[in-house]
């Protein structure tokens, strides 16, 4: 039904006071609306909440994007496939929650199991969840995974 496929999204731009920034904020909002449309997300959204995905979409097909995809994401996906594990799900939960305890609870696993899996992720990718720059790298990996899964 065509009626069910309609997306109605509105984006709220961050506040600004300089008139010359209208174009910048308009373009940012349009990019976020395009992203929401591709994700089939309706409603009123703040542009700032979607900027990381919007920014990453502009980096698609760059050497940096492909490097993260091949050195982290592809390796973890291959490991999960080969051993029927859930390292990517665990990583996503750990990055999303406020604490490892909350992430373990969300995954219905013991905290030591979560720590073991984070160690396994480090072994496979050479990225340490407990090091800020590596954690950022791992977050980009999860964002790329979602973009690839959603075919954005």
Where are these regions (language model features)?
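Cytosolic nucleotide-utilizing catalytic cores of signal-transduction proteins
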Residues: 1-152
């Amino acid at each position: 039904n065509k009626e069910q496929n309609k997306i109605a999204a509105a984006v709220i731009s961050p506040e600004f006071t300089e008139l010359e920034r209208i174009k910048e904020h308009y373009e940012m909002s349009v990019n976020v609306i395009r992203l929401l449309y591709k994700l089939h997300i309706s409603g009123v959204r703040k542009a700032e909440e979607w900027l990381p995905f919007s920014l990453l979409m502009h980096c698609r097909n760059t050497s940096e994007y492909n490097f993260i995809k091949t050195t982290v994401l592809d390796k973890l996906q291959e490991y999960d496939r080969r051993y029927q594990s859930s390292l990517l799900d665990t990583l996503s939960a750990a990055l999303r929650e406020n604490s490892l305890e909350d992430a373990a609870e969300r995954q219905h696993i013991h905290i030591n199991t979560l720590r073991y899996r984070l160690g396994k992720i480090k072994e496979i990718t050479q990225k340490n969840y407990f090091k800020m720059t590596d954690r950022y790298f791992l977050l980009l990996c999860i964002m790329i995974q979602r973009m690839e899964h959603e075919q954005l």
